[in-house]
Amino acid sequence: MCDRKAVIKNADMSEEMQQDSVECATQALEKYNIEKDIAAHIKKEFDKKYNPTWHCIVGRNFGSYVTHETKHFIYFYLGQVAILLFKSG
């Protein structure tokens, strides 16, 4: 399922971490069908790799307003699915 185009809408994050988040989300979308499971996979991977506490929202239709740590935020689309990933706490 490599036909999902990544479109980064907003990011306060290093290029390397942005690339990592897209790759991690791609793996999650290939492995899981349920949005909650996709979000859990991404969150757990980022907690492991970049230390806690990460939060992840996955879906096709949601609004958000969050506070995040500097350089630890990304909002992007993979195909039709939006992914919000940020560190706070």
Curated annotation (Swiss-Prot):
This is Dynein light chain 1, cytoplasmic. Induction: Up-regulated by ATMIN, PAK1 and estrogen. The gene is DYNLL1. Its main location: cytoplasm. The modification Phosphoserine is found at S88. Keywords: Acetylation, Activator, Apoptosis, Chromosome, Cytoplasm, Cytoskeleton, DNA damage, Dynein, Host-virus interaction, Isopeptide bond, Microtubule, Mitochondrion, Motor protein, Nucleus, Phosphoprotein, Transcription, Transcription regulation, Transport, Ubl conjugation. There is a cross-link at K43 (Glycyl lysine isopeptide (Lys-Gly) (interchain with G-Cter in SUMO2)). Ubiquitous. Expressed in testis. Changing T67A: Abolishes interaction with PAK1.
